[in-house]
């Protein structure tokens, strides 16, 4: 039987990030076109979760919240985890979100933020040599991401579709 009273549930808001050691859970809700990036160091039983909104900060002259952007938030999350004892060589990632929440009649790539977020997150993870183990991205439904730092598992609750483990 699992001792639930010792497990904390840490919330991550939109354009935010947080970390937790085992056996705690990190949860983010409201993943539409946004993407949740769960990074886990299995040797140190440490997890981090980032909820990004936009792919690239370079399009903006002033950045007030770096956690909004894939290109800034992911490296910040990794540095924060390293500061807590994690090693980037042990890190692996899982991602969810990146939905096309609006049905544009003009299928202009620039309007599909969800798809662009997915491309950017994968690019940043690759540049940082963090393997992407699994993903649940795309579609047109919102998601909740529940990251279990006990074993690195991630449950995705999709609107109208139940829960899926990635």
Swiss-Prot record:
Hydrolase in keyword set: yes
Enzyme Commission number? 3.5.1.44
MF (Gene Ontology)? protein-glutamine glutaminase activity
Record keywords: Zinc-finger included?
no
Give the UniProt keywords, A-Z: Chemotaxis, Hydrolase
- HAMAP family, alphabetized: CheD
Described function: Probably deamidates glutamine residues to glutamate on methyl-accepting chemotaxis receptors (MCPs), playing an important role in chemotaxis.
Task: Tell me the protein's name.
Answer: Probable chemoreceptor glutamine deamidase CheD
Classification lineage: Bacteria, Bacillati, Bacillota, Clostridia, Eubacteriales
The protein's gene is named: cheD
């Amino acid at each position: 039987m699992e001792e639930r009273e010792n497990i904390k549930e840490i919330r991550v808001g939109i354009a935010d990030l947080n970390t937790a050691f085992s056996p705690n859970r990190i949860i983010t809700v409201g993943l539409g076109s946004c993407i949740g990036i769960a990074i886990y160091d299995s040797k140190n039983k440490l997890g981090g979760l980032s909820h990004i909104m936009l792919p690239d900060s370079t399009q903006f002259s002033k950045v007030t919240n770096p956690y909004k952007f894939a290109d800034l938030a992911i490296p910040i999350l990794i540095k924060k985890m390293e500061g807590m004892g994690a090693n980037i060589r042990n890190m692996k990632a899982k991602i969810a979100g990146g939905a096309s929440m609006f049905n544009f009649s003009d299928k202009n790539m620039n309007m599909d933020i969800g798809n662009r977020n997915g491309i950017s997150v994968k690019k940043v993870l690759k540049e940082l040599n963090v393997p992407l183990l699994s993903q649940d991205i795309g579609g047109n439904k919102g998601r909740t991401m529940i990251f279990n730092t006990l074993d690195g598992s991630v449950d995705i609750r999709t609107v109208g579709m139940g829960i899926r483990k990635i």
